[in-house]
Regions:
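An extended, acidic, His-containing surface patch that forms the Zn2+-binding/catalytic region
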Residues: 1-52, 60, 65-73, 81, ...
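Active-site helix-to-loop segments that bind/position phosphate- or nucleotide-bearing substrates
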Residues: 57
Length: 198
């Protein structure tokens, strides 16, 4: 991965990570702010001072970090900033007793990260099948994403391997998400090769 090329492509004047490469950062947990809201803006703006603000957080994990404990760490951090944390809408009494109150709704359906070593026989077989369809390929040992692979591994008592086919600039989950047609055709050939894997 060429970090500078990606930074230019995304028009980013600064990136987090203290100078570490993206591949190294993918092996670290992260906290994303997926959205924030409070009051209105633009044509809907008023002179009302909003009484609340809402943020939606996304915790990205790596192997070895429990998803429930990570949520607890976030709550502990919020408390360390002087907030009284509640799990249900606060009563008037609580609001009167505390200068800063945070309502935190923890996710009840999270899951841990999974990682399959690339030197396992099944991983080598998958790589051989993909190479048979595509020729030389990029081996990507770690890939971020919210896929419940750990839950699948627990249920099936086996390891999981993902074989992505999307273009790197597909704008996944965005309004303009896209898939290049060549990636689709190449993906069909790749999946066919995997289906015929011995």
């Amino acid at each position: 991965v060429n970090d500078e090329m990606l930074r230019q492509e995304l028009s980013l004047g600064h990136v987090d990570g203290g100078g570490a490469h993206l591949l190294d950062l993918l092996n670290s947990p992260s906290l994303n702010i997926n959205g924030m809201s409070s009051g209105q803006t633009g044509a809907h703006a008023t002179n009302v001072i909003p009484s609340t603000a809402t943020a939606d957080l996304d915790l990205r994990l790596v192997v070895g970090i429990d998803w429930q404990k990570q949520q607890d760490r976030v709550v502990d951090y919020i408390r360390s900033q002087g907030y009284f944390v509640v799990e249900t809408p606060p009563s008037r009494e609580i609001l009167l007793q505390h200068a800063k109150v945070a309502l935190v709704k923890k996710d009840t359906a999270g899951y841990n990260a999974a990682r399959t070593p690339m030197d396992l026989p099944i991983a080598e077989e998958v790589l051989t099948a993909v190479q048979a369809a595509r020729g030389t390929v990029i081996e990507w040992p770690t890939m971020g994403g919210s896929v419940p692979l750990n839950a699948m591994e627990q249920a099936a008592q086996t390891r999981t391997i993902t074989v992505p086919i999307a273009n790197h600039d597909d704008n996944q989950h965005a309004a303009n998400e896209n898939l290049r047609l060549q990636n689709l055709w190449d993906g069909i050939e790749t999946m066919a090769s995997l289906l015929y894997m011995r």
